[in-house]
Structure formats: structure tokens, C-alpha cells
């Protein structure tokens, strides 16, 4: 979570809420500031020499866009620790798929007509593959639209995304198709 800004002066961060929650600031060789702000305080900043030095990073699933990511996803779904869990909980786990949070999990499940509470073991392999492809499609669409600016999200350039205008199910209490 959080937002990164590259600015000449903190005053250039136009939204007060981001200026109030600055947790790290670095002066770059060109004189600009590299600023980390995290309103929700979920993010963390660690200095490590290599990924192997930080175990949580070694456990992360491959990027969904990687060639072997679907096979990895299917293998994770077969694991006993996941088979009795709700599919939404599983696809939001960074050890199963990287980068699929609540918004994009909701949209992907809606696109494939899978109930979020459905147990992983009760979903066919073909349907899991369809779901994985939907996750990739939703993530690509989100990237193309600058992400979802729902509360405090901003792009690396500080701008708002527009994916929130394209969401079909997220934040609705009732399914529009059921």
C-alpha cells in the first residue's frame, strides 16, 4: 500500500492526506526527493541485500503474467492448506497469486461466475484455468487504466486511476446478474 512520489519539494504533493503520512524520504542524486506516504500503514520499507534475506519475498507467487504462473496457481490450489478454503481468500493470498487484492479478486470471480465463498476443491481444473485467465485480464485492464482510485491510491506519477469506473461487481451488495 502507500504511494511513492518524486518531487523537488514536499509541497508539490498536493493532497494534504499524503503529506501528513510521509514515512520515508530520500534525497536523490539529482536533488529531487523520493517520498513514501502510507495513509493506511500497511506498507513497509526494508533494506535487504538480496531477496533471499527476506523470507516473505521468497514465498511470493510468480507474477500472474509469467509463463509458468498458471501452472503454479493450479499446483497451489491442490495443496491441502488451500483446498477447503473459499476461492476468494485463496486468490488474494500472495503465495498463490501475486497482486490480486480484494478489488480484482471480486471482478475476476464475477467475470467467471464463481461464488467467492465456493471451496477451491469443488472448482474444476478448467474453471480454475478460466479464473486465472480472468485475473490476468482484469489486472491488465487495471494497469492500462492506471489502477483503481477508490480511497487513497495514486499512480507512481501521483495521478488517479480510472479502473474504478469500469468495475462491474466490486462494492456492490447484490450481484447485478443473479
PLM region descriptions:
Residues 1-99, 104-111:
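Phosphate/anion-contacting hairpin/loop surfaces
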Residues 13, 76-178:
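Basic, nucleic-acid-binding surfaces and adjacent catalytic neighborhoods in DNA/RNA-processing proteins
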Amino acid at each position: 500500500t502507500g504511494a511513492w512520489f518524486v518531487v523537488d519539494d514536499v509541497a508539490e504533493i498536493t493532497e494534504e492526506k499524503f503529506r501528513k503520512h510521509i514515512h520515508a524520504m530520500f534525497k536523490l542524486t539529482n536533488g529531487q526527493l523520493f517520498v513514501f506516504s502510507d495513509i493506511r500503514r500497511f506498507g513497509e520499507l526494508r533494506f535487504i541485500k538480496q531477496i533471499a534475506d527476506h523470507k516473505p519475498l521468497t514465498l511470493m507467487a510468480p507474477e500472474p503474467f509469467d509463463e509458468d504462473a498458471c501452472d503454479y496457481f493450479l499446483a497451489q490450489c491442490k495443496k491441502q492448506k488451500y483446498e477447503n478454503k473459499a476461492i476468494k481468500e485463496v486468490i488474494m493470498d500472495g503465495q498463490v497469486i501475486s497482486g490480486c487484492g480484494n478489488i480484482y479478486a471480486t471482478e475476476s470471480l464475477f467475470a467467471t461466475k464463481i461464488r467467492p465463498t465456493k471451496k477451491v476443491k469443488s472448482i474444476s481444473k478448467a474453471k480454475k484455468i478460466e479464473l486465472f485467465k480472468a485475473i490476468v485480464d482484469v489486472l491488465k485492464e487495471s494497469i492500462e487504466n492506471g489502477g483503481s482510485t477508490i480511497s487513497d491510491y495514486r499512480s507512481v506519477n501521483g495521478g488517479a486511476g480510472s479502473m474504478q469506473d469500469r468495475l462491474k461487481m466490486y462494492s456492490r451488495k447484490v450481484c447485478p446478474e443473479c
